[in-house]
Regions:
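Active-site cofactor/cluster-binding pocket
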Residues: 1-166
Length: 166
């Protein structure tokens, strides 16, 4: 959810693109599988949810099973390869693997896995200038300045991973 919110806020506040953010909460709200949809478009957005997605970011196995069928042919699938198998049963999508859980633990804080994956996504897709995304993260974490260096390192690591898989 954090990853989607950062992406939507950065795009909405700093570009001329149209953006929707649609979170889905349920029993999963505290630590389980939750999801959100972010739509970024140069055109007006008629509905916040579509039937087919261009890009899909998957952080766990249950999310892969639930949402992989909605990824369009030729779409980009970003997986947390620390815990999600790359045996996805589809050869018609571009697979971008990032061991974000492992990297976050190596950095000393599992919570930065979302920021690493955000960096992977932005680095791979170039959907938005990374500097704009980082400004949004800085703003969101302004009340917790001690978290900024670790999150900066996490975001930059993700950018490097994403760019390296283009």
């Amino acid at each position: 959810m954090t990853l989607g919110k950062f992406l939507a806020d950065a795009t909405c506040n700093s570009t001329d693109k149209n953006v929707t953010f649609f979170p889905s909460y349920g029993a999963e709200q505290r630590g389980g599988t939750a999801n959100c949809f972010v739509v970024i478009s140069d055109e007006a957005i008629g509905a916040p949810l579509g039937d087919v997605m261009d890009d899909l970011i998957v952080m766990n196995g249950p999310s892969l099973a639930k949402f992989l069928p909605t990824l369009k042919q030729g779409g980009n699938l970003f997986i947390n390869s620390s815990i999600v198998s790359d045996d996805i049963g589809r050869s018609d999508v571009k697979l971008v693997k990032a061991p974000v859980t492992e990297l976050a633990l190596e950095m000393g804080n599992a919570k930065v896995l979302n920021v690493i994956m955000l960096g992977v996504y932005v680095g791979y897709t170039e959907v938005i200038d990374p500097a704009i995304v980082w400004e949004t993260i800085e703003h969101k974490l302004a009340s917790k300045p001690k978290l900024l260096p670790l999150n900066k390192q996490a975001f930059e690591k993700g950018l490097e991973l994403g760019r390296g898989q283009r």
